Regions:
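Glycine-rich phosphate-binding loop and adjoining helix at the ATP-binding site
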Residues: 113, 117-215, 315-326
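Short, active-site-adjacent cap segments at secondary-structure transitions
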Residues: 160-163, 201-204, 226-227, 236, ...
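Glycine/GP-enriched mid-protein hinge/lid loop-to-helix segment characteristic of carbohydrate kinases
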Residues: 116-118, 125-130, 177-279
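Short glycine-aspartate micro-motif
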Residues: 82, 92-96, 104, 150-154, ...
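Short, acidic, Ser/Thr-enriched surface-loop or helix-capping motifs
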Residues: 108, 163, 230
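Short secondary-structure boundary segments
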Residues: 157, 221, 306-307
Length: 369
C-alpha cells in the first residue's frame, strides 16, 4: 500500500465485512513492520472509525496477532500507543512440486521464510509417492514451530490445472495427473486446508507483493517454461486457470516436436538451445516470446526466474531486453519495458505458494477471471 486505499480496499462498516476490516488493519500492521503504527493512523488509512479500529485491534491483541510497540510522540496531545504485528503468531507452508524436485518453506505472517527444505522428486512417480513426499515435508516444517498454528498449505505445481477445485489437468509430460484432485488428497493427508495454483502464478504473486511493479509478466524457465501475469495489481488466471500457458505458444510452425504434441513451441525451442549449449539463442527465443506478450498486453515489466535463468542471469536479461528493444525500434511498442530477474532462484515459487494461504488473511486476494 502507498498511503491511500482504493475503493475496493477501503473499510466498510457492515457486520458482514468484519473480517475484511480486520484484514485491512492486519495488512497495515504488516506493512508497518517493527516500527508499528498507531490506531489513529490505522483509522486514517482504512477509513474506519477510531472506535471500530479500537475494537479490531483489541481483538487482534487478544488473539496474539498484535502487540504494543511503545509510544510515539504526537503534536499537542498525549503520546500515541503504537501497535505492531506479531509475525510468528501464525505460519503457512508453501510447497513447490517441480518435475524433478520439491522445495518447501515455512513462512510467517511477515512473509519471511523461517525454515526451508529441498528434496529430489519424481513428478512422474505414482501419486501416492508424490503425496507422501509432500506430506512428509509439511510434517517436517511444522516440527520447526511445533506450538504455533499453521493456517494451511499452498501448493504450486506445473499447469494446466483448475485452482478453484484444486484439480490438475494434463500436465505436459505427465498425463497421469489429468483429473487428479490434488487439493483434497493432500488435505486428507495433512489435516490442513490446502490451496493449489500454478507454479508461475505463485511466483508472480511473490513478485507482486515484494514491490510495486505495475502490470508485468513473470517468465519461469526451469525444466519447463511458463508465465504468470499480474494485470491491474491482480494475478490473472483466466476463466479456467488457463492464462500463462506461455511455453506452448507456437513460435516456429515447422519447428521441433514438443512434449505437448505441438511443433515449434517456445519451451521446446528454448530448452533445445540450452541443451546445445547455445544460451544466447535460448535467450533470444525467450525474448521473442516476451516481446509478443509486451505487444499483446502492453505490460510495464518482464521478470525472469527459474533455475535455467539463474544459471546465467546476465545472458537472459541481455537477450530478452535486446529483442524487446529491437521490436520497440520498429514502432511495435515496448520502449518503456524493463527486464529484471526475480530474487531467490526457485524460492519465489514456494514462497508464493505460502502466500496463497496468507494473502486472504491480509485481504490481498486479487484474482482475475
Amino acid at each position: 500500500m502507498n498511503g491511500s486505499l482504493t475503493k475496493a480496499q477501503a473499510g466498510v462498516g457492515l457486520p458482514a465485512v468484519r473480517h475484511h476490516n480486520a484484514a485491512l488493519v492486519l495488512d497495515l500492521l504488516r506493512e508497518a513492520g517493527t516500527e508499528g503504527i498507531s490506531r489513529l493512523e490505522l483509522a486514517e488509512r482504512t477509513g474506519l472509525t477510531p472506535q471500530a479500529v479500537s475494537k479490531i485491534t483489541a481483538r487482534l491483541r487478544a488473539e496474539g496477532l498484535a502487540v504494543g510497540a511503545g509510544l510515539r510522540p504526537s503534536t499537542g496531545g498525549k503520546p500515541r500507543t503504537v501497535l505492531r504485528l506479531v509475525p510468528d503468531a501464525q505460519f503457512a507452508v508453501g510447497l513447490h512440486l517441480d518435475r524433478d524436485g520439491l522445495t518447501a518453506v515455512l513462512v510467517d505472517l511477515a512473509g519471511r521464510s523461517v525454515a526451508v527444505t529441498t528434496a529430489p522428486l519424481d513428478f512422474g512417480a505414482p501419486a501416492e509417492r508424490v503425496l507422501g513426499a509432500a506430506s512428509d515435508a509439511v510434517r517436517d516444517l511444522r516440527a520447526a514451530e511445533p506450538h504455533k498454528p499453521v493456517l494451511g498449505v499452498g501448493v504450486a505445481v506445473p499447469g494446466p490445472l483448475d485452482h478453484r477445485d484444486g484439480v490438475l489437468h494434463r500436465v505436459t509430460g505427465f498425463p497421469q495427473w489429468d483429473g487428479f484432485p490434488l487439493r483434497d488428497a493432500l488435505a486428507g493427508r495433512t489435516g490442513l486446508p490446502v490451496t493449489v495454483d500454478k507454479d508461475t502464478n505463485a511466483a508472480a504473486l511473490t513478485v507482486s507483493l515484494s514491490e510495486p511493479c505495475g502490470d508485468f509478466a513473470y517468465l519461469h524457465l526451469g525444466t519447463g517454461l511458463g508465465a504468470g501475469l499480474v494485470l491491474g495489481g491482480e494475478v490473472h488466471r483466466g476463466a479456467r486457470t488457463g492464462a500463462g500457458e506461455f511455453g506452448h505458444q507456437t513460435l516456429q510452425l515447422d519447428g521441433p516436436l514438443c512434449e505437448c504434441g505441438g511443433r515449434g513451441c517456445i519451451e521446446a525451442l528454448c530448452l533445445a538451445a540450452e541443451a546445445r549449449g547455445d544460451r544466447a539463442e535460448a535467450a533470444r527465443v525467450l525474448g521473442a516470446g516476451a516481446a509478443n506478450l509486451v505487444g499483446l498486453l502492453d505490460i510495464d515489466r518482464v521478470v525472469l526466474g527459474g533455475r535455467t535463468v539463474a544459471a546465467d542471469e546476465d545472458a537472459y536479461v541481455r537477450g530478452v531486453r535486446a529483442v524487446i528493444a529491437e521490436r520497440a525500434a520498429r514502432g511495435a511498442g515496448g520502449a518503456h519495458v524493463t527486464v529484471a530477474v526475480a530474487d531467490g532462484g526457485d524460492r519465489p515459487v514456494a514462497e508464493g505458494a505460502a502466500q496463497l494461504v496468507l494473502a486472504p488473511v491480509f485481504g490481498r486476494v486479487g484474482e482475475r477471471g
